[in-house]
Amino acid sequence: MHDAQIRVAIAGAGGRMGRQLIQAALGMDGVQLGAALEREGSSLLGSDAGELAGAGKTGVTVQSSLEAVKDDFDIFIDFTRPEGTLAHLAFCRQHGKGIVIGTTGFDDAGKQAIRDAAQDIGIVFAANFSVGVNVMLKLLEKAAKVMGDYTDIEIIEAHHRHKVDAPSGTALAMGEAIAHALDKDLKACAVYSREGYTGERVPGTIGFATVRAGDIVGEHTAMFADIGERIEITHKASSRMTFANGAVRSAIWLKSKPNGLFDMSDVLNLNNL
């Protein structure tokens, strides 16, 4: 292994996203797949991670114990569920390993645990790791500053039938970007559901609508609607590889950061645009 390479460990190796992450790690220059993890009792334990992902034999077998592979990776990549991610986060903090977190659905306590851990280790935490989505978030900030005070703002998102949290983390990130640009607190202005006799739309609110159907990878639209015209800013993902490649790219970037909490805008240097 060349000194410039970083070794990554992939959580949830047998899942849809886990397999894509393995493919991305194996296909990206400067990266070595060091470990792959699955939950205790999984039928996939002992499988070759590369074969599991359809990328050929790698010699890296799927394990259930982080302790057993702690010397095999530099950066941990986790797109699982909040309770599992927080356990992995605690391990990484204890052992000085950076972590890339793509898990969504954290409550306030979980988000605080991530902030606390960032005092000791480097963390990239993002709702969406695609380059396109993060460019969209920057566009939303600019659109909100120009149009947000006098338009009705709605965010519509669609995902596959298996997604367990709603609204999506990306939809919430869109709302946060818009609210921040307008000096608002999203918790105070978000409307997550409408049913029955709701009365007229309350000015200054940000509405959310959710679709769960079929195999939709991810579609997000922000609408700025006025009387007579509206602007819609949309991102559509057709492959999870865009998220996987972004996450592995983040791991490479994170290797040089001893501690701190970052997101994709830092990785892509979007804050200077």
Swiss-Prot record:
SUPFAM superfamilies: Glyceraldehyde-3-phosphate dehydrogenase-like, C-terminal domain, NAD(P)-binding Rossmann-fold domains. Keywords: Amino-acid biosynthesis, Cytoplasm, Diaminopimelate biosynthesis, Lysine biosynthesis, NAD, NADP, Oxidoreductase. The active site is at residues 159, 163. It catalyses: (S)-2,3,4,5-tetrahydrodipicolinate + NAD(+) + H2O = (2S,4S)-4-hydroxy-2,3,4,5-tetrahydrodipicolinate + NADH + H(+); (S)-2,3,4,5-tetrahydrodipicolinate + NADP(+) + H2O = (2S,4S)-4-hydroxy-2,3,4,5-tetrahydrodipicolinate + NADPH + H(+). Pathway: Amino-acid biosynthesis; L-lysine biosynthesis via DAP pathway; (S)-tetrahydrodipicolinate from L-aspartate: step 4/4. It is an enzyme of class 1 (oxidoreductase). Homotetramer. HAMAP family: DapB (MF_00102). This is 4-hydroxy-tetrahydrodipicolinate reductase. The lineage of its organism: Bacteria, Pseudomonadati, Pseudomonadota, Gammaproteobacteria, Enterobacterales.
